[in-house]
UniProtKB/Swiss-Prot annotation:
Keyword Repeat: yes
This protein's name: Transcription elongation regulator 1-like protein
WW domain mapped to chain residues: 148-181, 339-372
Superkingdom to which the source organism belongs: Eukaryota
Organism: Homo sapiens
InterPro entries assigned: FF_domain, FF_domain_sf, TCRG1-like, WW_dom, WW_dom_sf
GO molecular function (one): transcription coregulator activity
Bias (Basic residues) ranges: 7-23
Chain spans, region Disordered: 1-30, 281-344, 378-448
One Gene Ontology cellular component: nucleus
Length: 586
């Protein structure tokens, strides 16, 4: 009993010694006495976030991260003492009449708030789901006397073109942002919380496992210094765009005014500015961006305001390149191909004498040599000897003999044409245009009947060595570059290939059978010529005649042994018959 009482006393002492957590206080604007100025939020040395319930209207809140230090204070602010900690406005606060003047007359104690770092904390007593979260991100602005809140929590995230910086304490969700007129933080421009005018935009991304909307700070020029007593317009707007799933917070700072600069020294604070462009959480609905859209890592970007002139310029379609498409398309077409022996790759030549490598099994085309073919010595020989040039060289030699006679004929034709043109005179421009059109139009192609095209296609399959025991996809690389391949459409090609395979299986089976019979006969001739005795073994025979061409015609080892054993059995039967005859004769 005494031990239990001691334990209870010790527990109470420890509870009394521990500092109690203070909940953040809410200051309504219509309360008496009036609250402090509605445009200041005291921020700790490192970045954080505040979470408010989604069902609650955004209240006029003033939260201080810690009690303000006694010194140093910013000079020139006699009404409301502001510490030298960096200040950042995060919420739009409706201003009551003469709230700033009343705040100057009534100093307020420092309020205790809690900054959440990178996660949902139950300390504020809010549900984890359906929340609006504010994440202060500090952009690189102009230099100032205020201390920078950058600590070890900043890390740089790099993408191939440039760097961006944000706090590693937060798990920012990925958002799609149109990249035009955007600004990234580069490596030498680490973000600082400095004095300038900023625009705060909240965006709620698509529903995810852990929704965490981001806050983007866009710098804007300062029209003038802000003083100790500021008035904000009485009609602040909290615009919620449900279609874009984004919330925008804005306060118009145009009517900022204060006492004369002779009495108070100007100080640049961070104030809210109107926002017209929210952070987009879905891909931009633009034809150009949809065509060239590439998946990007999660990036934090600063967007500038788009003018109406810029919108009109964006709507104009980009200039299309044209002119030499037909010529380049003709030159880039594949002309010939040869398979590389012992590999799935094929060497393909185009019309402009370029070479690329095609893998039909992987459906992959590569300009550079694949890793499988880099150590091949015969590849250079294949590339230097294209098959389509071999065919062209043969008729070129035949035509070289009759070139002299053709030159003479051409000279005569040119002379006769000159005489005709001199007699007829210059033609009219309309007639010249017609002649040009007539020369440009290609001659009509004569389409062969279907039966002839089918026979040509089958001949191609036979010549190219298409296997009947393979599939269409595997044998496609053998025939795809042949001009006869284009005689039929895709459906007809597959139908004829299936018919060819069915008939070809029977033919190949017969061919294999006939080849095996021929090999068997040649093997028997070898056995007879070798004068094998019934006592010789197959191992001895193979060592002696293994290099003979007739021995190699039978490819399988089992067939060789089978034929050898059959021949040995025949020899043994002959020996038995001969012995029986000799016994009968005796």
């Amino acid at each position: 009993m005494q031990a239990g009482a001691r334990f209870q006393r010790r527990r109470r002492q420890l509870q009394q010694q521990q500092p109690r957590r203070r909940q953040p206080l809410l200051w309504p604007m219509d309360a008496e006495p009036p609250p402090p100025p509605p445009w200041v939020w005291m921020v700790p040395g490192s970045a954080g976030l505040l979470r408010l319930s989604a069902g609650v209207v955004v209240p006029p809140v003033l939260l201080a991260s810690a009690p303000p230090p006694a010194a140093p204070l910013l000079p020139g602010l006699p009404g409301w003492p502001a510490p030298s900690e960096p200040v950042l406005p995060l919420l739009p606060l409706p201003s009551a009449p003469d709230s700033a003047a009343a705040a100057a007359a009534h100093p307020f104690p420092a309020l205790h708030g809690q900054w959440l770092f990178g996660g949902h904390s139950p300390s504020l007593g809010l549900p984890p789901s359906s929340t609006v979260e504010l994440v202060p991100v500090f952009p690189h602005l102009c230099p100032s006397a205020l201390a920078t809140p950058i600590g070890k929590s900043w890390i740089d995230k790099r993408i191939p073109n440039c760097k961006i910086f944000f706090n590693n304490s937060f798990a920012l969700d990925s958002t799609w942002i149109h990249p035009e007129e955007s600004r990234f933080f580069h490596g030498h421009e680490k973000p600082r919380l400095l004095a300038n005018q900023v625009a705060v935009s909240l965006s709620r991304p698509a529903p995810a496992s852990r929704p965490l909307p981001t806050v983007v700070l866009a710098p804007q020029p300062i029209p003038g210094g802000c003083h100790n007593s500021l008035k904000v317009t009485s009609s602040p707007a909290i615009a919620i765009a449900t279609a874009a799933a984004a919330a925008m917070v804005s306060v118009d700072p145009e009517n900022l005014r204060g006492p004369s600069p002779s009495s108070v020294q100007p100080r640049h604070f961070l104030t809210l500015a109107p926002i017209k462009i929210p952070l987009r959480t879905s891909p931009v609905s633009d034809t150009r961006t949809e065509r060239g859209r590439v998946a990007r890592p999660p990036a934090l970007m600063l967007r500038a305001q788009k003018s109406r002139d810029g919108d009109k310029e964006d709507k104009e379609p980009p200039p299309m390149l044209g002119g030499g498409e037909d010529s380049t398309a003709r030159g880039n077409r594949p002309v010939a191909s040869t398979p590389v022996p012992g590999s799935p790759w094929c060497v393909v030549w185009t019309g402009d004498d370029r070479v690329f490598f095609f893998n039909p099994t992987m459906h992959l085309s590569v300009w550079e040599k694949p890793m499988d073919l880099k150590d091949r010595g015969d590849l250079n020989r294949i590339i230097e000897d294209p098959p389509h040039k071999r065919k062209l060289e043969a008729p070129a030699t035949d035509n070289s003999d009759g070139s002299s006679s053709e030159d003479n004929r051409e000279d005569q034709d040119v002379k006769t044409k000159r005489n005709r043109t001199e007699g007829c005179g210059s033609p009219k421009p309309e007639e010249a245009k017609r002649e040009d059109k007539g020369t440009r139009t290609p001659p009509p192609q004569i389409l062969l009947p279907l039966e002839e095209r089918v026979t040509h296609f089958r001949d191609m399959l036979l010549e190219r060595g298409v296997s009947a025991f393979s599939t269409w996809e595997k044998e496609l690389h053998k025939i795809v570059f042949d001009p006869r391949y284009l005689l039929l459409n895709s459906e007809e090609r597959k139908q004829i290939f299936e018919q060819f395979v069915k008939t070809r299986i029977k033919e190949e089976y017969k061919e294999k059978k006939s080849k095996l019979l021929l090999a068997k006969e040649e093997f028997k001739k070898l056995l007879e010529e070798s004068k094998v005795s019934p006592r010789t073994t197959f191992k001895e025979f193979a060592e002696k005649y293994g290099r003979d061409q007739r021995f190699r015609l039978v490819q399988k080892r089992k067939d060789q042994e089978h034929f050898f054993n059959q021949f040995i059995l025949i020899l043994k039967k002959r020996d038995k018959e001969n012995r029986l005859r000799l016994r009968k004769m005796r």
